[in-house]
Amino acid sequence: MSNSVEERTRIKNERYESGVIPYAKMGYWDPEYAVKDTDILALFRVSPQPGVDPIEASAAVAGESSTATWTVVWTDLLTACDLYRAKAYKVDAVPNTSDQYFAYIAYDIDLFEEGSIANLTASIIGNVFGFKAIKALRLEDMRIPVAYLKTIQGPATGIIVERERMDKFGRPFLGPTVKPKLGLSGKNYGRVVYEGLRGGLDFLKDDENINSQPFMRWKERFLYSMEAVNRSIAATGEVKGHYMNVTASTMEDMYERAEFAKQLGTVIIMIDLVIGYTAIQSMGIWARKNDMILHLHRAGNSTYSRQKIHGMNFRVICKWMRMAGVDHIHAGTVVGKLEGDPLMIRGFYNTLLLSELAIDLPKGIFFEQDWAALRKVTPVASGGIHCGQMHQLLDYLGNDVVLQFGGGTIGHPDGIQAGATANRVALESMVIARNEERDYVAEGPQILLDAAKTCGPLQTALDLWKDITFNYTSTDTADFVETPTANV
């Protein structure tokens, strides 16, 4: 080999191109790529900066979420770089927009540690959302291959086993959040739990921010709550539960609280989304080993899931949480006070409940998904709902859901037990009408009025809340069809 600089440079350039070159040219754009069954697929909504080609922007997302950095590095030659590069293989304009694009990206399964939501997310959403060439970026959907799902535990209990444990079949579960969420003493807290369960509810729950504050420490809350559960079971003959929030500052504290809850005899514990993916997976594994139902409150999700052009769609969180091992997750109400377009909510529920998903663009489902026998997650509908909406809730959300009437139980003028009874009677009257094949949606208001003739608490609730609703336009709506975004 010649020792001249020119000759060494020529040979190097034939083998390896250095410097800053476009991501698309580096191999992160491949429109001919044949997607493998084992690939992890992601769909991003990409909003490039003015002047940035959408294909180059999509290739940049693929590169920065897999193996690339800002310049070519020679150590690529020490890896199977052609295999490990993520490939943007399809870029489509988003309907009815001028500067948004759907980028389909494939990742080889070997890029990810088996069974680790933390590692999966570190690549997919780890760094790329701050990329300057893109003014906004949103992760809309993912396909997780069966080969990867087989390394994941999935829900600790699942809805089928939960129904068997709770002895509740043929209708939604009922349960509100204790209100006010903060400030009650342990004894008063337990009284709220007892009254709600005694009145006919299946569950009560802690709220997301009740942990162990000076006005009520966690152990005090657990003791009074379980006393209430046991007394209500004795009084009604029904299986009851209370979601005990074990969220804490360390895993050691969470395990301690969960173990104490188990010793008290609870059938369900609760955690918050804000504890993080590793902590959620860890608690899912604990719950499976200890035959415990695991409820997840989605606290904090709207900071990144609500806006349409940046962040992450809630359906992706649903997929990750089904993998992580939770049994419940709040997933929207349609008619309540929180964000919820009807088609988007249906897509979330399908993601949590179906064994296989087909592509359904109006509901925001971009990929087929085989869940590989992972158990089903029960969606939770909570926030601004009341018994006067029971026909709508049953129609939109179906049987497999927890309907949580917090203010709609505890705000009843005649007390908590009356509020619980109103909700139970409203639900059972609507389920009976449905099972009789009546048009319970159209007849819903009259069905409730008829039931109220023999249930004073229901009549009082209907008189109080009437047809109150939170009629605001949703921010996260379908891209492929027009959809009613306000409550209907």
From Swiss-Prot:
Q: Which reaction does it catalyse?
A: 2 (2R)-3-phosphoglycerate + 2 H(+) = D-ribulose 1,5-bisphosphate + CO2 + H2O; D-ribulose 1,5-bisphosphate + O2 = 2-phosphoglycolate + (2R)-3-phosphoglycerate + 2 H(+)
Cofactor(s) it depends on: Mg(2+)
Q: Can you tell me which residues bind Mg(2+)? A: K205, D207, E208
Answer yes or no on keyword Magnesium. yes
What subcellular locations does the record give?
Plastid, Chloroplast
Modified residue annotations for N6-carboxylysine: K205
Query: What are the BP-aspect GO terms?
Result: reductive pentose-phosphate cycle
Q: Give the record's cofactor note, including how many are bound.
A: Binds 1 Mg(2+) ion per subunit.
- Cysteine disulfide links: none
Q: Residues at site: Transition state stabilizer? A: K337
Q: Which GO terms describe its molecular function?
A: magnesium ion binding; monooxygenase activity; ribulose-bisphosphate carboxylase activity
List ligand-binding residues for substrate: N127, T177, K181, R298, H330, S382
Bilayer-crossing residues are: none
Under InterPro entries, the record lists: RuBisCO, RuBisCo_large_chain_AS, RuBisCO_lsu_C, RuBisCO_lsu_C_sf, RuBisCO_lsu_fd_N, RuBisCO_lsu_N_sf, RuBisCO_lsuI
The residues forming a coiled coil are none
Assign the protein's first listed, main location to one coarse class: plastid
EC numbers listed for it are 4.1.1.39
Active site (record annotation): K179 (proton acceptor), H297 (proton acceptor)
Keywords assigned: Calvin cycle, Carbon dioxide fixation, Chloroplast, Lyase, Magnesium, Metal-binding, Monooxygenase, Oxidoreductase, Photorespiration, Photosynthesis, Plastid
Gene3D superfamilies found in the cross-reference section:
Ribulose bisphosphate carboxylase, large subunit, C-terminal domain, RuBisCO large subunit, N-terminal domain
Functional summary from the UniProt entry: RuBisCO catalyzes two reactions: the carboxylation of D-ribulose 1,5-bisphosphate, the primary event in carbon dioxide fixation, as well as the oxidative fragmentation of the pentose substrate in the photorespiration process. Both reactions occur simultaneously and in competition at the same active site.
Q: How does it assemble?
A: Heterohexadecamer of 8 large chains and 8 small chains.
Miscellaneous comment as given in the Swiss-Prot or TrEMBL entry: The basic functional RuBisCO is composed of a large chain homodimer in a 'head-to-tail' conformation. In form I RuBisCO this homodimer is arranged in a barrel-like tetramer with the small subunits forming a tetrameric 'cap' on each end of the 'barrel'.
The UniProt entry's sequence similarity note says:
Belongs to the RuBisCO large chain family. Type I subfamily.
The record's PANTHER family line, in alphabetical order, gives:
RIBULOSE BISPHOSPHATE CARBOXYLASE (PTHR42704), RIBULOSE BISPHOSPHATE CARBOXYLASE LARGE CHAIN (PTHR42704:SF17)
Q: What is this protein called?
A: Ribulose bisphosphate carboxylase large chain
From what organism does this protein derive?
Antithamnion sp.
**Gene name of the encoded protein:** rbcL
